[in-house]
């Protein structure tokens, strides 16, 4: 069943003054991407060690990939080889690394979300999140799909994780996190399951999902923030994360329907960043 369309204000963005657009753009950059990034109340614990132990992460392949990107930092190596009791911080320097460690977690962790997913079946390896995961011992990431009990959830925690997964989307497609057919979906699922296992509420998980998606799809969320401010009159800190992460704004089709046509009216006043997002390692 398609979601209800959003109620849009009658504001015509083509009438907004260029100086206001520029000022709101700069403000949105600061609000979405603080200098130190976002630190969230989720810890990796021993989840990555378990992924290495079962072969879902091949440490040598992982190191080799990052050699061409300047190498892994001491801290990054540490969280791949030791339990981590530190809260996760996401920023532009580590957003790709976090994507690549959370991806196999969401892919390999045994959970009803994956059990009930359209991915579950003989063709599981045909999806970008499974077949595209080549940093395990086996080059076919599909062999790790829904296989290991890495994060255990109580029935209450499962209900929370399931609800958030079913109601969060990503701009590269029209599927919810509960259908994690690409790396961003699998990574967000892993993060949501971790957070739920550590006692976070639905509200916290929607907020954290929005923060991570913003760093993974920066241009898209800058435009969503501008849409909220210039079209709807809502400052980014006051935006409802559950609404912003929903189909109407965070899915590819929703964004194309509601956000892009409005932003296209002012696009010539916006900086052209050209920061594309890929669904591979």
Which positions does each model-derived feature cover?
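Acidic/His-rich structured neighborhood in mature extracellular/periplasmic domains
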Residues: 21-186, 201-203
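A cross-kingdom marker for long, charged
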Residues: 170-171, 180, 186-189, 193-281
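N-terminal, intrinsically disordered, polar/charged segments of Gram-positive cell-envelope systems
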Residues: 1-23
């Amino acid at each position: 069943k398609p979601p209800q369309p959003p109620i849009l204000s009658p504001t015509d963005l083509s009438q907004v003054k260029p100086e206001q657009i520029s000022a709101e753009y700069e403000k949105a950059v600061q609000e979405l991407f603080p200098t130190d990034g976002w630190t969230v109340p989720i810890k990796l614990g021993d989840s990555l060690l378990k992924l290495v132990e079962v072969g879902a992460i091949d440490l040598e392949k992982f190191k080799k990939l990052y050699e061409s990107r300047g190498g892994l930092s001491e801290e990054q190596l540490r969280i791949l080889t030791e339990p981590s009791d530190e809260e996760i911080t996401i920023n532009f320097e580590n957003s790709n690394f976090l994507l690549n460690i959370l991806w196999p977690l969401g892919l390999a962790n045994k959970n009803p979300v994956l059990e009930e997913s359209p991915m579950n079946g003989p063709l599981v390896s045909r999806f970008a999140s499974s077949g595209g995961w080549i940093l395990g011992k086996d080059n076919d990431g599909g062999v790790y799909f829904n296989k290991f009990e890495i994060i255990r959830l109580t029935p209450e925690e499962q209900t929370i994780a399931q609800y958030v997964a079913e109601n969060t989307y990503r701009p590269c497609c029209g599927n919810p996190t509960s259908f994690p057919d690409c790396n961003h979906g699998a990574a967000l699922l892993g993060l949501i399951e971790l957070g739920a296992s550590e006692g976070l509420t639905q509200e916290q998980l929607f907020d954290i999902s929005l923060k991570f998606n913003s760093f993974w799809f920066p241009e898209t969320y800058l435009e969503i923030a501008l849409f909220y401010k210039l079209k709807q009159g809502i400052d980014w800190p006051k935006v409802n994360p559950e609404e912003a992460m929903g189909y109407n704004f965070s899915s590819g089709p929703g964004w194309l329907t509601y956000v892009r046509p409005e932003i296209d009216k002012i696009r010539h006043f916006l900086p052209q960043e050209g920061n594309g997002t890929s669904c591979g390692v």
